[in-house]
Amino acid sequence: MRLTVELIQNSLSYINPLKDRELDLRDNDISSLGNFPFFPRLRMLLLARNRVRQIQPSLANSIPGLTTLVLTANNIAELADLDPLRNLTKLTHLVLLENPVTRKEYYRLWIIWRIPSVRFLDYQKVKDAERAKAAELFGTATEPTALASKILGVKSRTFDIPSGGAADQPPPEKRLRVKLTDSERKRIEKMIREAKSLQEITRLERELNEGRIPGGALDGAGNDGDQMQL
């Protein structure tokens, strides 16, 4: 199951006692962490007890201000699978308990080295001695050791399988894919970036899923740009 705007809308989002914007997505069936709308004010993301095994490389572009990420009891398996988190430059608190990756050799030192902004890992403060040991083992970002290069080369092969099986998917002959020109694609991306609400993003996503090009994105008036391909 992928994260959708509808799921975000239906989840708890509030200001916590620390005055931070918090989004609670615990106890869902999410397998891929990504597909967020632009959410610059989000500070805390709770994702415990999902099925997350993949983190999209573009995650930091959508939630650049994230400081706390709780991924307890998910399915992340390899150290390199966590690499997209290093682009969350404000991430200080990370929880990965009850993921297969925590059983990997060098797990804690790897996170400390690869995501240097993290100050608390699995509720334990990162110590200066740990940072020094991590640097000794893995080198620097520009000059990694052979061990670091080896770890970076091992990633999980991930597939997004719907939780309800094949019945959740429409038959192949019913799936519509919109043909977009480069200019139409850029306009749609701009419309999503400049959307003022989640409802507006939902509308754009729904129109695309239904095989329609949102108004304002078509090339020219009366253009037949909303042709659909079965």
From Swiss-Prot:
LRR repeats lie at residues 19-40, 41-62, 65-86. It is found in: Nucleus. GO terms for cellular component: post-mRNA release spliceosomal complex; U2 snRNP. GO terms for molecular function: U2 snRNA binding. Residues 211-230 are annotated as: Disordered. The keyword Ion transport does not apply. One of its GO terms (biological process) is mRNA splicing, via spliceosome. Residues 99-137 form the LRRCT domain. Keywords: Leucine-rich repeat, mRNA processing, mRNA splicing, Nucleus, Repeat, Spliceosome. Residues 213-223 have a biased composition (Gly residues). Its main location: nucleus. Involved in pre-mRNA splicing. Belongs to the U2 small nuclear ribonucleoprotein A family. Associated with the spliceosome. This is U2 small nuclear ribonucleoprotein A'. The lineage of its organism: Eukaryota, Fungi, Dikarya, Ascomycota, Pezizomycotina. The gene is lea1.
